[in-house]
Amino acid sequence: MTQLPYLLDRRGGALAAPATAWGDMMLNRALFSVALLSSVGSAWVVLSYACIKELRSYRHQLILGLAISDLLMSLNFMFSAGWNVAGGDLALEESRTACSVNGFLTQVFVVQTDWWILVIAIATYIILGNFKTQSQFIQTHVWIPWVGPWVLSIIIAAICHGVLGYGYIGGWCWLTSDLMRLLINFIPRWLIVIAIALIYIRLYMIVRKARKWDIEGVSPDPGDDMADTSVILMSVGKKDRERQGSGVLVSRDVSVSFGRKGSTAPTFVTMVTTSGAGDSREAISSCSAREEGSRARTVNVNSSRSLSLGMRQPLNAAQLKRIAKKMMVYPVAYAIIWACPTAIRIYQGTTGSRAPLWITIVDKSCIVIQGLVDAVVYGLNERAWQGWRDHIRRIIYKNEGGRIIG
């Protein structure tokens, strides 16, 4: 009896691929939908950077690099899944070239997003950790963090293509051996997750100590290694966010520096700037409500770009706690979405058995959804929403005679 096409046995392929053509079709339909969501999330981050000047800080330039990689990876997944949904089959010999290209791009962008995540964490630590020389260097040589992820990922993908080759694994083409994918991609990714966890734990401790000083009014010991640490609440942007003539400038950078001076007074920051066209000066403000002897607790605002005119930012415990919690979201998010794929690689690589279809769909969806997760972690925040609201207002309203009118 002739088997129906959608029931054809495909167990001769990679373990990661479904055993039947019907299962493969279900997998590809699910992955195409997830990849579409990821591409929308990544495009949101890219579009936000392009349209909103407030989201063009140095750190956002690195996030842009991650978003571009996520977007390209999502489009690559949409291509492979769409190819199979439309009636093609990347597992066939005649599709070998397309499969090799798809596998190469998959390897490039999976590795690349790993390195982008690490680069962002390291850059954040350098800036928040008050490493002034290193911070100035990386911010004046923006191209260096951009080159690293691209060069490393392309080299690794090229070596894998030459030594192992790429084949269809269900949904897309990649390294067909679960054990090889585990060794080349998953173990390095977990090392990166551990590294960024350690980095953000250190930053969490920095912010937590700052919060403790703010609550208790306790200044750091002169010998404390935290004494010269700066906690940046807002990033430095390339251009001022300015409404001409209205005197409204929104804060760009707030650096809370706990020096070797202290007091028991609540801390706040006063930000000043000039509002003349093309005029930007360094704003430095120190506030202290009370002094004890020769020790005074100061909060310094240092920025080469304009800050809010006469605007005060209370640095209360809730703010510092929120910042500390947000830092820990990054490693936790990546650990969650990669836990299932890693477990499946270990299971299939050691037992040689194929996982059930529904587990395969969940497994691959966790990989494809990374673009959406990155968009939520890095791109969906109050600052982005406020930036979009202001951007829409600028489109709706005209600026005439130095004042905004309807």
Curated annotation (Swiss-Prot):
Disulphide bridges: C99-C173
Pfam families: Git3 (PF11710), GPR_Gpa2_C (PF11970)
Ranges per topology, Extracellular: 1-29, 83-107, 165-185, 348-356
Disruption phenotype: Decreases cAMP levels following exposure to C.elegans. Decreases trap formation following exposure to C.elegans ascarosides ascr#3 and ascr#7.
Cited InterPro entries: GCR1-cAMP_receptor (IPR022343), Glucose_rcpt_Git3_N (IPR023041), GPCR_2-like_7TM (IPR017981), GPCR_Rhodpsn_7TM (IPR017452), GPR1_C (IPR022596)
Membrane topology value: Multi-pass membrane protein
Name of the featured protein: Ascaroside receptor GPR2
Gene3D superfamilies named among the record's database cross-references: Rhodopsin 7-helix transmembrane proteins
GO biological process: adenylate cyclase-activating G protein-coupled receptor signaling pathway; cell surface receptor signaling pathway
Subunit structure: Interacts with ascaroside receptor GPR3; may form a functional heterodimer. Interacts with guanine nucleotide-binding protein alpha GPA2; to activate adenylate cyclase and positively regulate nematode trap formation.
Keyword annotations of the record: Cell membrane, Disulfide bond, G-protein coupled receptor, Membrane, Receptor, Transducer, Transmembrane, Transmembrane helix
Assigned GO CC terms: plasma membrane
Transmembrane regions listed in the UniProt entry: 30-50, 62-82, 108-128, 144-164, 186-206, 327-347, 357-377
Subcellular location: Cell membrane
Induction of its expression: Induced following nematode exposure.
GO molecular function, one term: G protein-coupled receptor activity
Family: Belongs to the G-protein coupled receptor 1 family.
Function text: G protein-coupled receptor that senses nematode ascaroside pheromones and signals via adenylate cyclase to positively regulate trap formation for nematode capture.
Cytoplasmic topological segments: 51-61, 129-143, 207-326, 378-406
